[in-house]
C-alpha cells in the first residue's frame, strides 16, 4: 500500500499534514505530490480538488480510501490497521 499526499507549498494545512505523517507506519510508502508540479497528471487522475488530500492505494493502484483536508495521523493509522486486519 502507499499513501499519496496531494499538497502545495502555499497550503498551510498541507504543512501541518506533513508533520502528521511522521506517525504513519513505516511499511506504508508515502508519496508526496505537489499539485502545482504534477507532471504525471495524478491530480487529475484521482480528481483532487482541494488540499491536502490523502489517498490510500493498493498494490494495483486501486483506491482504498481518501481523506480531504487536515486529517490526524491516528485517524489514518486506525483505518490502515482495520483494513489490514480484514485482508
Where are these regions (language model features)?
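Local sequence-structure signature of Cys/Sec-based thiol-disulfide redox active-site neighborhoods
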Residues: 1-24
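Non-catalytic, surface beta->alpha helical segment in thiol-disulfide oxidoreductase systems
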Residues: 55-87
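CheY-like receiver
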Residues: 42-45, 79
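Structural micro-motif
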Residues: 46-55
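Chalcogenol-based redox active-site neighborhoods
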Residues: 19, 24, 45-46, 73
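Thiol-based oxidoreductase modules, predominantly thioredoxin-like and allied folds used
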Residues: 6, 26-40
